[in-house]
Amino acid sequence: MHRMFGTDGVRGIANKELTPELAYKLGKAGAYVLTGRCHKPKILVGMDTRISGDMLENALVSGILSIGAEAICVGIVPTPAVAYLTRKYNADAGVVISASHNPVEYNGIKFFNGKGYKLSDELEDKIQYVIESNFKDVSIPIGSKVGRKIMETGEARKAYIEFAKSTIDTDLKDLKVVLDCANGASYVTSVKAFQELGAKVKVINNEPDGININHNCGSTHPENLMKTVVEEGYDMGLAFDGDADRCLAIDEKGNLINGDFIMAIIAKHLKNQGKLYKNVVVSTVMSNVGFDIALKEEGINTIKTQVGDRYVLEEMRKEGYKLGGEQSGHIIMLDYNTTGDGLITALQIACIVKKSGRKLSDIASMMKNLPQTLVNAKVPDDKKKIYMEDEEIVLKIKEIERKLHGCGRVLIRPSGTEPLVRVMLEGEEQGEIDKMAHNLAELIEVKLN
């Protein structure tokens, strides 16, 4: 069975791969699977600012109503707001229509369970099975048993803003902040939260027209934000992506503060307050070695997962850890929300700067990124996972690890989509690791071709 669901719901080019017909089926099957035998189940629906959002929302909601469920439509809100509001409204499930940081032609449909967590693979497979079996044995309500659509846009947005503000214990008066909303879902919520907390706020890229989401702006294109912060003398910049589940920061000197730095800063702050469970942070294998070194010096341990925020969250829930995330700015704080939350991340950073009275560049200096290099080895698809079976390659990796003597690492990852093996090295000397990475990639190509 070809899986309909990827790592972040069902995604594709809107009206071509993710069609209104598919959205209708997902709404109908999702409502059926996720609400069980509830008398009048409720499903909360939110979306980002893409032009295709209205088309897909109408189709999705039709599917939900056709099964007898109520659809609570909260309009344009961040993905983490849907996770929070699903809990607040005691909904049986939540759905967000968004393709996150991807270009405008893409869209996606992602489900949350009643507790605000992304669905397990098993539940996603059940939804797919119901669709592929053409809704066999699914009873269709008529008359008064058909579902209703309930509009909750203003109140729901306000509730999320109040919730986000409640996660910090200080105002932000006298703090000068530039927000880059990526012409996306945070264009109201983030701005209002910072303004209501008293910050002096300049906003860029907060005029969504349905087409300009993520276009040369937001967390994937922070160059304009960096320039604005420096030229206009702001304390910091904060960049969100299209659905605002991630956030990156810019210090007062215009330096990018990525997710590794943000996790390190928040981890140290939480540890100092005695709030970092077991003094552990969960990150992915892509986090820089400098992140591990910085946290080790603070008496904080790091646990690594494979790439993807769902794997970070899995590890956190399994062991009860409270802080985790990715270099890309997906930061999960389970004391507050069940998914990466850009606004909560932004508020934590602003709160730490305000309470410390220090510059963000000074706070971020607790960590130094080690130089990093990435070289692709071209390898046939059927051979790219067997590199560890070759003795010469294994010996070469061990030799490089010895040369790095604990101040660097070798990470080798077969590409999931291309005939490539990615060779990533980190170490203290850029020239040295460039040479070692190229030599290793060449050896992998020779031995596996």
Swiss-Prot record:
It comes from the Bacteria. Its cofactor is Mg(2+). SUPFAM superfamilies: Phosphoglucomutase, C-terminal domain, Phosphoglucomutase, first 3 domains. One of its GO terms (molecular function) is phosphoglucosamine mutase activity. Its EC number is 5.4.2.10. It is an enzyme of class 5 (isomerase). It catalyses: alpha-D-glucosamine 1-phosphate = D-glucosamine 6-phosphate. GO terms for biological process: carbohydrate metabolic process; peptidoglycan biosynthetic process; UDP-N-acetylglucosamine biosynthetic process. GO terms for cellular component: cytosol. Keywords: Isomerase, Magnesium, Metal-binding, Phosphoprotein. Mg(2+) binds at residues 100, 241, 243, 245. Activated by phosphorylation. Binds 1 Mg(2+) ion per subunit. Pfam families: PGM_PMM_I, PGM_PMM_II, PGM_PMM_III, PGM_PMM_IV. The keyword Metal-binding applies. The modification Phosphoserine is found at residue 100. The active site is at residue 100. Belongs to the phosphohexose mutase family. Catalyzes the conversion of glucosamine-6-phosphate to glucosamine-1-phosphate. NCBIfam families: glmM, PRK10887.1. This is Phosphoglucosamine mutase. It comes from Clostridium kluyveri (strain ATCC 8527 / DSM 555 / NBRC 12016 / NCIMB 10680 / K1).
